[in-house]
Design a protein with these regions (language model features):
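H-loop/switch region of ABC-family ATPase nucleotide-binding domains
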Residues: 40-41
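A short, surface-exposed alpha-helical micro-motif characterized by mixed small hydrophobic
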Residues: 46-48
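Catalytic Walker B motif of ABC-type/P-loop ATPase nucleotide-binding domains
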Residues: 5-8
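ABC ATPase nucleotide-binding domains
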Residues: 79-100
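ABC ATPase "signature
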Residues: 64-65
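ABC-family nucleotide-binding domains
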Residues: 15
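Helical segment within the ABC ATPase nucleotide-binding domain
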Residues: 20-32
Length: 100
């Protein structure tokens, strides 16, 4: 069992069966107290696996905390430069682009 697992875009370009397999394995390791560091642009990955999120822009931390603190309209607007609306309904996240 690894003490630390470092992942870079762990489910990018995978079919859904493979994505769920990876997510399940990462969750299993997390329950065994493996520390997991993951780099990803996929918000849906973050919400299924990780309890702490650090958001970086230009190499600087712009947000750090749990999902509910970090994944919000202000942070995503700042990070990506687009206007979005973020809602969380009992763990079901929805990110909608706002078009002017």
């Amino acid at each position: 069992k690894p003490k630390i697992l470092i992942l870079d875009e762990p489910i990018a370009n995978l079919d859904y069966k493979s994505k769920f397999f990876v997510i399940d394995k990462v969750n299993e390791l997390s329950k065994l107290n493996t520390k997991i560091l993951c780099v990803t642009h996929d918000i849906s990955t973050i919400t299924k696996i990780y309890d702490r999120v650090i958001m970086l822009k230009d190499g600087k931390i712009i947000a750090d905390g749990d999902q509910n603190k970090v994944i919000n309209s202000e942070n995503l607007n700042n990070l990506y430069g687009i206007q979005v609306e973020v809602t969380n309904n009992n763990g079901l996240w929805n990110i909608k682009r706002l078009i002017k």
